């Protein structure tokens, strides 16, 4: 784990950590998201990651949780622009929960419709497998 320094924080001695966190390679290994993608998320404003004194990104639990949630949203085919809109609202803080809720509910409806389509397609595949004597 590497120490993170925050702007305006008092300098710490070599053994005194301002904050512990994980480097980009460790987060990539934990989340399955490539370092390139993690950097991309930062560039497009989805992820703001503090840096240590040497300029390396240091991910805390909040950043890791965000990466995991972004990954789940992407798995459901939520467009990047919608994920950006959601996290813009989150980053603005309290007062826009209704907008966040509406965005997530709309996406949930899209996901449920897609699941229904996939279940129908799976049924057709299962039928063909049974036709050929498979199980």
Which ranges hold each PLM region?
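Short, Lys/Arg-rich nucleic-acid/phosphate-binding segment
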Residues: 51-56
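Arg/Lys-rich, alpha-helical DNA-contact motif
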Residues: 1-24, 29, 48-49, 61-135
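Conserved active-site tyrosine of GNAT-family acetyltransferases
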Residues: 41, 59
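Glycine-centered, phosphate/nucleic-acid-interacting loop/turn motifs that mediate DNA/RNA or nucleotide
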Residues: 45
């Amino acid at each position: 784990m590497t120490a993170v320094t925050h702007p305006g924080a008092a300098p710490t001695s070599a053994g005194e950590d301002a904050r512990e966190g994980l480097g980009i390679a460790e987060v990539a290994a934990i989340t399955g998201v490539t370092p390139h993608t993690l950097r991309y998320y930062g560039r497009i404003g989805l992820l703001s990651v503090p840096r240590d004194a040497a300029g390396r990104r240091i991910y805390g639990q909040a950043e890791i949780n965000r990466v995991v949630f972004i990954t789940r949203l992407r798995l459901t085919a939520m467009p990047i622009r919608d994920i950006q809109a959601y996290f813009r609202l989150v980053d603005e803080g309290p007062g826009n929960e209704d907008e966040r809720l509406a965005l997530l509910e709309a996406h949930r409806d899209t996901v449920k419709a897609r699941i229904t389509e996939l279940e129908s397609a799976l049924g057709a595949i299962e039928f063909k497998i049974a036709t050929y004597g498979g199980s």
